[in-house]
UniProtKB/Swiss-Prot annotation:
This is tRNA-2-methylthio-N(6)-dimethylallyladenosine synthase. PROSITE patterns: MTTASE_N, MTTASE_RADICAL, RADICAL_SAM, TRAM. Catalyzes the methylthiolation of N6-(dimethylallyl)adenosine (i(6)A), leading to the formation of 2-methylthio-N6-(dimethylallyl)adenosine (ms(2)i(6)A) at position 37 in tRNAs that read codons beginning with uridine. Its cofactor is [4Fe-4S] cluster. Residues 134-367 form the Radical SAM core domain. One of its GO terms (biological process) is tRNA methylthiolation. Belongs to the methylthiotransferase family. MiaB subfamily.
């Protein structure tokens, strides 16, 4: 039998899709890239914004038209968690709904009709941390915590993924060793507040924090690089930043989700920090790691965001000069504090602000790309580049998170670390050639 999975949203969803495939493989399901041939179609959903939810029902309609007569459609993930049985009412072609914290129950629901499994067990002793068989990969996703205890006014994630619990370190290290033995060179650690690791376990464990975990993972033979997402700026204290800077296996790229450059808006968002505090953390980080790559999230048009508030955001953009920007217009979500507010920034104003923000960021990327020419980076080979069935090079990421396209005549295998020199750029993209390998 064949299964097709459509994955929306974040890296956590990608990891959950891997888990779904692993569970289904025990029932002799094989993954297919063609939904028309599938016996089971799964849509793993995102609910951070309204747009992916609208897309969900469009996707369901399309799959219902092209699927095999007896094929089933299942909806999984965060939208499944908060909409539950309402999905079955709105889309009768859906056979079952499986919440974000119920992935391991896939084998129990695929043979049922109109099944709904979305409840989260909030008894901490009942949490089970099951790892699963994964395909051999150069880069592997690894959960280190589940859920979120933050109360950001705009965010539905605490409702859909439940309380924040850290996975015991010994289980994480055991899984990381298995991945390394299976060929993994780079780990991507996952958690809703990944750098708050160790704040709460499901039972008694030795006191450890995120930096302790990074140090232990770095000792595993075969693991060359470690990345993580998504951290919270509040937990980027001096101690963490210093250990981040010193650990040679921890990639010198970091996600620092700003959300807004206005202290007033940040207070309304319940983020727990100010514009000045955020800039202080960036300044400290750059003092320790001058070449660090920084990515961020920014929401424009949050309720009551004024022109001055937006200008504060633009000011932070200019000062930090982020390497990657994920930016969106505010989207009201159910089960959130801000979702109940009546105040709204007009869509045309929000759209104008978003366009200005994104256009300026594109200019910043081009300015930064010019400065990269002549610099060297060590790239982890991810994919080979081919032209007319001939290998012409490879592509991969630097330690600082830069995606680089490399031209070379020698054959380079995925997983190799290769020194390259940047020779040109185009629209923020970096091109390189091998150097002294």
């Amino acid at each position: 039998m064949k299964v097709y999975i459509e994955t929306m949203g974040c890296a956590m969803n990608s990891r959950d899709s891997e888990h779904l495939l692993s569970e289904l493989s025990k029932l002799d399901y094989k993954e297919t890239n063609d939904p028309k041939t599938a016996d089971l179609i799964l849509i793993n959903t995102c609910s951070v914004r309204e747009k992916p939810e609208r897309k969900l029902f469009s996707e369901i309609g399309q799959f219902a038209k092209i699927k095999k007569p007896n094929a089933k459609i299942g909806v999984c993930g965060c939208t499944a968690s908060h909409m539950g049985a309402d999905i079955l009412k709105k889309a009768p072609s859906v056979s079952f709904v499986l919440g974000a914290r119920n992935v391991s129950k896939i084998s129990q629901v695929i043979h049922k009709e109109k099944a709904v499994e979305v409840a989260i067990d909030y008894d901490e002793s009942a949490y089970a941390f099951e790892f699963f068989e994964k395909k051999a990969q150069i880069r592997s996703l690894l959960n280190i915590s589940i859920g979120c205890d933050k109360k950001c006014a705009y965010c539905i994630v605490p409702h859909t993924r439940g309380k924040e619990i850290s996975i015991p370190m010994d289980l994480i290290l055991k899984e990381a060793e298995k991945l390394a033995n299976n060929g993994t060179k780079e780990l991507m650690l996952l958690g809703q507040n990944v750098n708050n690791y160790g704040a709460r376990f499901s039972s008694e464990h030795a006191k450890v924090d995120f930096s302790d975990l990074l140090d232990k993972l770095s000792e595993i033979q075969g693991i060359e690089r470690i990345r993580f997402t998504s951290p919270h700026p509040l937990h980027m204290n001096d101690g963490f930043l210093e250990r981040f800077a010193k650990n040679p296996k921890v990639c010198k790229s970091i996600h620092m989700p700003l959300q807004s450059g206005s202290s007033a808006v940040l207070k309304m968002m319940r983020r727990g920090y100010s514009k000045e505090w955020f800039l202080n953390r960036v300044e400290r980080l750059k003092a320790l790691v001058p070449e660090v790559g920084i990515s961020t999230d920014i929401i424009v048009g949050f309720p009551n965001e004024s022109d001055k508030d937006f200008e504060d955001t633009m000011e932070v953009l200019e000062k930090v000069r982020f390497d990657t920007l994920y930016s969106f217009i505010y989207s009201p979500r159910p089960f959130t504090e801000a979702g109940a507010w009546k105040e709204r920034v007009p869509l045309e104003v929000s759209s104008s602000r978003l366009e200005r923000l994104q256009n300026r960021h594109k200019e910043i990327l081009e300015e930064k790309a010019k400065l990269e020419v002549g610099k060297t980076h060590v790239v982890l080979v991810e994919n080979r580049r081919e032209m007319d069935n001939q290998i012409v090079g490879f592509e991969g990421r630097s330690d600082t998170g830069k995606f680089i396209e490399v031209t070379c005549k020698e054959k380079r295998n995925p997983g190799e670390l290769v020194k390259v020199e940047i020779i040109s750029h185009s629209k923020g993209r970096l091109m390189a050639a091998t150097k002294g390998n």
